[in-house]
Curated annotation (Swiss-Prot):
Keywords, ordered alphabetically: Cytoplasm
Protein's UniProt keywords contain DNA-binding: no
UniProt function note: Modulates RecA activity.
Protein name (Swiss-Prot/TrEMBL): Regulatory protein RecX
Cellular component annotations (GO), alphabetically ordered: cytoplasm
Protein location: Cytoplasm
InterPro entries for this protein: RecX_HTH_1st, RecX_HTH_2nd, RecX_HTH_3rd, Regulatory_RecX, WH-like_DNA-bd_sf
């Protein structure tokens, strides 16, 4: 069986050591592995010893890689597993690393889910449906997700939905009443709010235009339609403009009134 004849520190990484067996380089190990296996000059190693040492070093390297990955932000177990797989880490090593991360409390899917939901609810205004899908994609189990999102009360969801509607009303002033409602519904659905929350939020919102605002919105759209369809007072071009404005949510009476004033 070979003996350790030399141990030297690596130049680029002083936490790693080169092991020489019978005067020939054999492998390198982390400082922790060196201590754990009591590697020193003159120690005899058989084949099984070497395999065990190398496996221990693989675990240590993967663990360090995982800790670095976790240093940027909280991660779910699945995110860490996927990261290590991309680095071609063997499944057995990954499983041991995950176990160690839980032991050190570096991983906790419940705490991760709570932090993720809280952050994205506040910063991105996401609703529970989107949060559920995103947490599911990150490997969080259904029970944990449901428990996490149960803290997002119905009233809180309505308040978040109202913020989105407020932004739409502030930004898009030249919209018909129908368009405002449709745009708000679509935006809230994309953000992951359920229909009962959307309807409740819309009921609490004064989004209907007064007559003057509605006519201003109609005028803005009509000017686009007149240019687009080259309105010249003819029946054909008039119908195209009317259809366009009707699809935008304006009433026939308001459309006719506007076109009559244009003639």
């Amino acid at each position: 069986m070979p003996f350790i004849t030399k141990i030297s520190t690596q130049k680029k990484n002083t936490e790693r050591f080169n092991i020489f067996l019978d005067e020939k380089y054999a492998f390198s190990v982390d400082a922790d592995v060196l201590v754990r296996f009591d590697l020193k000059k003159g120690k005899e190693l058989d084949e099984l010893d070497i395999l065990e040492i190398q496996y221990g070093d693989d675990v240590k390297k993967a663990f360090n890689r995982a800790v670095e990955f976790l240093s940027y932000r909280m991660r779910s177990e699945k995110e860490v597993r996927d990261h290590l797989k991309k680095k071609e880490t063997p499944d057995m090593v990954i499983s041991e690393v995950i176990h160690k991360l839980y032991d050190y409390r570096y991983l906790n899917d419940k705490e991760f889910a709570e932090a993720y939901a809280s952050t994205h609810k506040k910063t991105n205004g996401k609703g529970p449906d989107v949060l559920f899908r995103e947490l599911k994609a990150k490997g969080i189990d259904d029970d944990t997700i449901k428990e996490t999102l149960s803290a997002f009360t119905f009233d809180e969801q309505i308040q978040e939905a109202l913020k989105h509607i407020g932004k739409i009303l502030k930004k898009d002033k030249k919209l018909s009443t129908k368009e405002i409602r449709q745009r708000a519904q679509m935006q809230l659905q994309r953000k992951g709010f359920p229909f009962d929350v959307i309807n409740a939020a819309l009921e609490q919102t004064e989004y209907e235009n007064d007559d003057e605002a509605e006519m201003e919105a109609l005028k803005a759209h009509a000017e686009k339609a007149i240019r687009k369809y080259r309105y010249d007072g003819s029946y054909e071009s008039g119908m195209k403009v009317k259809q366009y404005l009707f699809r935008k949510g304006f009433s026939i009476d308001d459309i006719d009134q506007f076109l009559q004033e244009e003639e």
